[in-house]
C-alpha cells in the first residue's frame, strides 16, 4: 500500500507551517506540507518589501499563541529565516510547486491529488491563506460546523480563537 500520511497540510504559509510543526511535535510523525508556490510563505515573499516589519497582530487583533510554535514581530527576512529553521529542524517533508487539484474522502482516508502526484492521508488541513482560492462546497455546511469552518477572517471578533 502507498504511504499514508497522518496529516497533509495544504498551504505553506505561516499557518500551514505552524500546523505541520505542531502536529509533528504532538506525535504525528508522518506529515506532509503541500504548497503551490516555489517556496513557503508566498505572500510575505512577493508582497513585503525588504526589511518590512512582520507583526504577529493583525488589524489590532490579539494573537495569543496556544501552541509550541512561537511567532514574534520581526522583519520579512527574519520571519522567512524562522520558518526555514522550523521546517529544517523538524525535518518536515514539503513539496513545492504542488498545487492541490482535489481532495476526496474515500472510506477512512483522504485522497489528495496534485498535477504530479496522488497522496493519501488520515487527516487533511486546508490552510491556503490570502492567495488561495478555495472551491467552496456546493452543499450547505451543517449549522453545527459553522463555528469551525471559516472562509474569511475579516469579521473575526476580538478574543475569538481561530
What are these regions (language model features)?
Residues 15, 39, 131:
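Conserved Rossmann-like nucleotide-cofactor binding loop
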Residues 45-117:
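N-terminal Rossmann-like dinucleotide/flavin-binding domain of flavoprotein oxidoreductases
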Residues 1, 128-162:
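Glycine-rich dinucleotide-binding loop and its adjacent helix/turn
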Residues 4-5, 121-122, 159:
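Active-site acidic short loop of glycosyltransferases
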Residues 8-10, 34, 112, 118-132:
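Short hydrophobic core segments
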Residues 2-33, 162:
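N-terminal Rossmann-like FAD-binding beta1-loop-alpha1 element of flavoenzymes
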Residues 29-36, 44, 126:
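Short beta-strand "acidic-cap" motif of Rossmann-like dinucleotide-binding folds
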Amino acid at each position: 500500500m502507498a504511504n499514508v500520511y497522518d496529516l497533509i497540510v495544504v498551504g505553506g504559509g505561516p499557518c500551514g507551517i505552524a500546523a505541520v510543526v505542531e502536529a509533528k511535535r504532538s506525535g504525528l510523525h508522518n506529515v506532509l506540507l503541500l504548497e503551490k508556490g516555489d517556496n513557503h510563505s508566498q505572500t510575505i515573499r512577493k508582497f513585503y518589501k525588504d526589511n518590512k516589519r512582520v507583526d504577529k497582530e493583525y488589524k489590532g487583533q490579539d494573537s495569543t499563541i496556544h501552541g509550541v510554535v512561537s511567532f514574534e514581530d520581526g522583519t520579512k527576512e527574519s520571519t522567512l529565516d524562522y520558518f526555514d529553521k522550523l521546517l529544517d529542524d523538524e525535518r518536515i517533508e514539503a513539496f513545492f510547486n504542488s498545487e492541490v487539484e482535489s481532495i476526496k474522502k474515500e472510506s477512512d482516508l483522504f485522497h489528495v491529488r496534485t498535477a504530479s502526484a496522488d497522496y493519501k492521508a488520515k487527516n487533511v488541513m486546508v490552510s491556503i491563506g490570502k492567495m488561495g482560492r478555495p472551491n467552496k462546497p456546493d452543499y450547505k455546511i451543517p449549522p453545527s460546523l459553522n463555528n469551525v469552518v471559516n472562509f474569511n477572517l475579516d469579521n473575526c471578533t476580538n478574543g475569538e480563537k481561530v
